[in-house]
Amino acid sequence: TGTDGMAYTSTIFPIIIAAWLASKIEPWLKRWIPAVIHSMFAPLVEIFVVSSLVLVVFGPLVMILSGFITNGINSIIDYNYIVAGLVIGGLYQTLVIFGLHWAVIPVIAAQLSNGSESSRINAIVSVTMIAQGAGALAIWVKSKNPRIKQIAGPATISAMCGVTEPAMYGLNLKYGRAFITASIGGAVGGLVTGLLNVNMWGFTGAFIGFPSFINKHSGEIDASFTGFWIASLVTLVVGFLLTYLFGFKDSDLETERKVEKVRLGRREPVAN
């Protein structure tokens, strides 16, 4: 079928659309389904309609959007690696939020599976991981709140090892400005990556991925390895300083974003 192989389960776009559809369908079902059987049949009809529309219509549309993003990234890199580093470095982790980065990963895998190729895209992605870790590190240093420090310390280590979700969802996105300042650090790091023409021969990024920047053909430490460390350290410093100075303060804890659990098609929160 037209949806075979379309892995859009890791993007939040279908979830957002499903929630919106449910909010529109549920009042209509209340009017048309008799009250005596409403509690039994309304949820079934709602789930069937919403799931069908998401799987058949909106999911494939998300994959088409992902394809445009992939082609755009490749075009920018082919046009100018420096510009690509700036743009991708600043925006890649935003793609992660919406799950659209899964469109880029197969491109990276295809590049690395070809024995003669390296991946410039992945070299840029690597510094974006460090940038989010730098934001979490700044929060860990600046905050006086023990709970935040307990979150920020492990999140920093995780991001520096290539897993950014704890830093992003646990801290940087929750205190909005921190994500922006960290992303600016990623943009600067990506710019430096492009300026130094850094190539990458492996999949693992961030600091733990440093062996991936050793030229696998010659086995020697060349300009890409040196460029990786320069770009990574620049990213760390810029992301840390911007977040420390402008991205976070403990008073933000009073207005942190709260997420309430809701049932599909219902507006009122569910009691925990």
Predicted regions, residues:
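Core mid-bundle transmembrane helix pairs that form the ion/substrate translocation pathway
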Residues: 26-99
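Structural signature of hydrophobic alpha-helical transmembrane segments
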Residues: 5-17, 71-73, 79-81, 122-126
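Hydrophobic core segments of alpha-helical transmembrane domains in multi-pass membrane transport
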Residues: 12-24, 46-56, 89-94, 131-138, ...
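Juxtamembrane interface elements at the cytosolic ends of transmembrane helices
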Residues: 16-34, 58-66, 103-105, 242, ...
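Interfacial loop/helix-cap signal at membrane boundaries in integral membrane proteins
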Residues: 1-12, 213-220
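Transmembrane alpha-helix interface/packing and boundary motifs in multi-pass membrane proteins
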Residues: 89-101, 112-117, 158-161, 193
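Helix-loop-helix junctions within the multi-pass membrane cores of secondary transporters/permeases
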Residues: 105, 109-186
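Transmembrane alpha-helical segments and their short flanking loops
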Residues: 146, 154, 166-272
